[in-house]
Curated annotation (Swiss-Prot):
Keywords: Ribonucleoprotein, Ribosomal protein, RNA-binding, rRNA-binding, tRNA-binding. One of its GO terms (biological process) is translation. GO terms for molecular function: rRNA binding; structural constituent of ribosome; tRNA binding. One of its GO terms (cellular component) is cytosolic large ribosomal subunit. The keyword Phosphoprotein does not apply. Belongs to the universal ribosomal protein uL16 family. This is Large ribosomal subunit protein uL16. Pfam families: Ribosomal_L16. NCBIfam families: rplP_bact. Residues 1-19 have a biased composition (Basic residues). It comes from the Bacteria. Binds 23S rRNA and is also seen to make contacts with the A and possibly P site tRNAs. InterPro entries: Ribosomal_uL16, Ribosomal_uL16_bact-type, Ribosomal_uL16_CS, Ribosomal_uL16_dom, Ribosomal_uL16_sf.
């Protein structure tokens, strides 16, 4: 699972879901990529699930890059707890994703198989996304 090794503060404010991505909007390493079309918090489990879906489809011969990292903790209070008495304990680690951000990149010789693998990964994510290539970036 992807979680930070050490953080300065255990609990943080929730990141805002507004604006567009300022960096990481182009395919830099691979030939194909998954680009976010909306805002979302993507958890470490969802990132891992998408990575496994890609790797199982391409088997061998390709390389996958994960361009996001879940660096923000989201907290939750226990069920049936009264209001007050402080902030809840950290439950998940999330990556704050903005529109235009490239989430995954893939280098694979066969375009059709690469697109199928990335489509399977998109289905694992809680966000609308599209597949882009190195040539068709905006």
């Amino acid at each position: 699972m992807l979680i930070p090794r050490k953080v300065k503060h255990r609990k943080q404010h929730h990141p805002k879901k507004k604006g567009t991505a300022s960096g990481g909007t182009t395919v830099a390493f691979g030939d194909y990529g998954i680009q976010a079309l909306g805002h979302a918090y993507i958890t470490n489990r969802q990132i891992e699930s998408a990575r496994i879906a890609i790797n199982r489809h391409i088997k061998r011969g390709g390389k996958v890059w994960i361009n996001i990292f879940p660096d923000r903790p989201l907290t939750k209070k226990p069920a049936e707890t009264r209001m007050g008495s402080g902030k809840g304990s950290p439950e998940w680690w999330v990556a704050n994703v903005k529109p235009g951000r490239v989430l995954f990149e893939l280098s694979y010789p066969n375009e059709e198989t690469a697109r199928q693998a990335l489509t399977r990964a998109i289905h694992k994510l809680p966000i609308k996304a599209r597949i882009i290539t190195r040539e068709e970036q905006f």
